[in-house]
């Protein structure tokens, strides 16, 4: 499974570490990552992939949304195919 993950929220120490640790726990590989800070607002976009026989998209989504809620961040995940289709419009 290939997916795009976005993380947005108020800047705080350890955002990248929290997200990377959760992805590692889920056995999700970070293929590419980009982040920036805009007036104390943190934004990050990740390209990720994993074996969907081991972890469903729904389970990955639930785990990342839970992390987002606990960390006061908005974390969204989209299937790469959906993201690609949206970009073509």
From Swiss-Prot:
Stretches that traverse the bilayer: none
Pfam short name (any one): ACT_6
Cystines in this chain: none
Gene3D superfamilies referenced in this protein's UniProt entry, alphabetically: 3.30.70.260
Annotated signal sequence range: none
InterPro entries: ACT-like_dom_sf, ACT_dom, UPF0237/GcvR_regulator, UPF0237_ACT
Domain ACT, chain residue ranges per copy: 4-78
HAMAP family: UPF0237
PANTHER family from the UniProt entry: UPF0237 PROTEIN MJ1558
Family under the similarity heading: Belongs to the UPF0237 family.
Protein name: UPF0237 protein lp_2508
